[in-house]
C-alpha cells in the first residue's frame, strides 16, 4: 500500500517456504554422529581400534 500496491495481511505461507528452503540447504551439512569435543594431539588416519 505504501508504494501503490494492494494491501494484504501477512501470512505464514511465505515464512514456511523460507524456513523449509533454509532447512533443505543445511541438511547436507548436518553431522551423522554426535559431536564429541576433543584435543587433537596426533594427526593421521587411525582405525577405531587405534583410537
UniProtKB/Swiss-Prot annotation:
Coiled coil: none annotated. Its EC number is 3.1.4.-. It comes from the Eukaryota. The active site is at 11 (proton donor/acceptor), 38 (proton donor/acceptor). The keyword Hydrolase applies. Disulfide bonds: none annotated. Substrate binds at residues 13, 40, 43. Keywords: Hydrolase. One of its GO terms (molecular function) is cyclic-nucleotide phosphodiesterase activity. InterPro entries: Cyclic-nucl_3Pdiesterase (IPR012386), Cyclic_Pdiesterase (IPR009097). Hydrolyzes ADP-ribose 1'',2''-cyclic phosphate (Appr>1) that is produced during tRNA splicing into ADP-ribose 1''-phosphate (Appr-1''p). Belongs to the 2H phosphoesterase superfamily. CPD1 family. This is Cyclic phosphodiesterase. It comes from Triticum aestivum.
